[in-house]
Amino acid sequence: MRMRRLGRTGIQVSAYCLGTMVFGKMGNPDHDDCVRMIHRALDQGVNFIDTADVYGYSETEAIVGKALKGRRDEVVLATKFNGPMGEGPNRGGSSRRWVVQAVEGSLKRLGTDYIDLYQIHHPDPHTDVEETLSALTDLVRAGKVRAIGSSNLPASEIVEAQWVSERRGLHRLRTEQPTYSILNRAVEREVLPVCHRYGLGVLVWSPLAMGLLTGRYRKNAPRPDNARMNWVSRHLTDERKLDAVEQLLTLAEEAGHSLTHLAMAFATSHPDVTSAIIGPRTMDQLDDLLTGASLTLGDDILDKIDAIVPPGTDIGPLDVSYVPLSLTRTDLRRRPSHERAAAR
């Protein structure tokens, strides 16, 4: 397994990061099987594991913690906070109040006294970034966290966070975790260049585009009836995306590779990508992914991929890496109705 430096942290991580979102009720409910998969990945050279408190509402972190007993020192362990964790208005988000509470829960479930990489899971429009960075800085100084990062942030918020850290003498975000795949290349426009500018490590999620780049889901073919497919079925309504998959399948076949291996090699070929997160649900899926870990693509193949999905573009609006709240929330685009009525 190839090793790469995680930004400027000095930490070396594997080119594949084991993602655990589908360990537990969100995919594979057999905890022992999930533990065996984690051990298999470690035995095959993967030293980077990513999870989150919200995955399975704490179930997944507990599985990871069980698997790492006796092997903690082998792993660069990353987790995330910010998602809603039960009842109550303050059990989520990026406030200091929640950050210091969330990390204690993660440490307990993971069975460790420190987290290598603690990440803000999503943008939080209700909390000043200085509030969050100040709390995270205290965690680093307390030895509970080694490095801090973000996930799903737009380029503007990454820049703002770097500026605030420098101005206030706070620890910097050292990584970003965006979605990136052949079908979702929007981050090549701003996010990846910004990460390069500030020396951030980049771990990308969904390099297989929610499974579309496995070749399992074909145009005009029956769709599997399972919980995961029901969750991502909205991504199968875009004919342009399915057309691209057919072209990519042909390209992969001509090159003598599976589409899965082609897609993973594409994601790790970008010079600003440190590690690509794999999310296997079964041991067979994990073994197949690891088999292709050494594949690299030549310029001829990458040029053909560019012709199918041009650099910096997405196929379909559902793949946009970050949609500002100013677009999704009408209250941020329209004055209150009573004000508009009074102005008539």
Language-model-detected regions and their locations in the chain:
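Short, well-ordered coil/turn segments that N-cap beta-strands
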Residues: I11-Y16, G45-N47, R71-V75, G111-D116, ...
